[in-house]
Amino acid sequence: MGKRLRAQRRGTGGSQYRSPSHRHVDDIRLPAFDEGAGTIKDLIQAPGRTSPLAVIDFNGETDYQLAVAGTKVGQQVTVGGSKVAAGNITSLYNIPEGTSIHNIEAKPGDGGKFVKTAGSSATIVSRGEKVIILMPSGANKEFNPNCRAVIGVVAGGGRGDKPLAKAGKNYLTLRSRATANKWVKGVAMNAVDHPHGGGSHPHVGGPNCQSRTASPGQKAGFIAPKKKKRK
């Protein structure tokens, strides 16, 4: 019997495939309270995240939020209200059209789900019964006006400008997210290791398209591909 595929091993959720959450600083969620003010005490780098984090003191209670481009240590940020300034957290109906925002809630009170990558932001397009937001993908998405978001652009937008240059740096970067930096292709394996392996030739040697309902061990190659459009 052949060995399990990489996707099958990953699906069991072993420690080598799970994100090392014990090294993560905190679960980044918008504050649970509706109104308040805090002060940025520090800006730190967090393993497993592409952007730095801001350490914010809310009346003696420490909270971690995604750092916003242009903010600095000692700056005051507010929760609630209608003041439009980088780093402030407020409901979507308070934010005027054309404003850049990030860490948007999918449902009121869920803590923020959308637009959390370094350098990313979304834009308010219109407000009414639903707030329409232009997402980084280019799609327009509707949100409940009571959903909250952070005003500004996520910091760390230039992280891709400097090349990694060394395989070791790439390895350490991806390890913080439990992602491998090297992948062996199936045709280079032995037949016992992969359906595409064996045969002493660098090609699959047969059909490499699989049905959507195929068993997990068969799912190697193209899964339920669509037909190529004819011009």
Locate the predicted segments by residue.
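Basic, glycine/proline-rich low-complexity segments that contact nucleic acids
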Residues: 1-51, 73-231
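Short, conserved beta-strand segments within well-ordered enzyme catalytic domains
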Residues: 53-57, 64, 78
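Conserved strand-loop elements at the edges of beta-sheets that form or border functional pockets
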Residues: 58, 67, 126
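Glycine-centered tight beta-turn/hairpin loop motif at sheet-sheet or coil-to-beta transitions
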Residues: 58-61, 136-138
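Beta-strand/loop nucleic-acid-binding surfaces
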Residues: 61-72
